[in-house]
Amino acid sequence: MKRTYQPSKLVRKRRHGFRARMATKGGRGVIAARRNRGRKRLSA
C-alpha cells in the first residue's frame, strides 16, 4: 500500500507557502493570526 505522505518541496511551498497564504483572504487571516501569536515561522 502506498503511503499518504509523499514529500515534495515544490508542492509544499505551492500549497502552504507564504505566497499561497497571501493569495486569499482566509490565508491572510492565517498569517495575521500567526503574527499576533508570535510564531517564529509564519508559513511552510
From Swiss-Prot:
Keyword Ribonucleoprotein: yes
Biological process (GO), any one: translation
Alphabetically ordered keywords of this record: Ribonucleoprotein, Ribosomal protein
Keyword Ribosomal protein: yes
Pfam entry (one): Ribosomal_L34
Annotated S-S bridges: none
NCBIfam families named in the record: rpmH_bact
Name this protein carries in UniProt: Large ribosomal subunit protein bL34
Gene designation per UniProt: rpmH
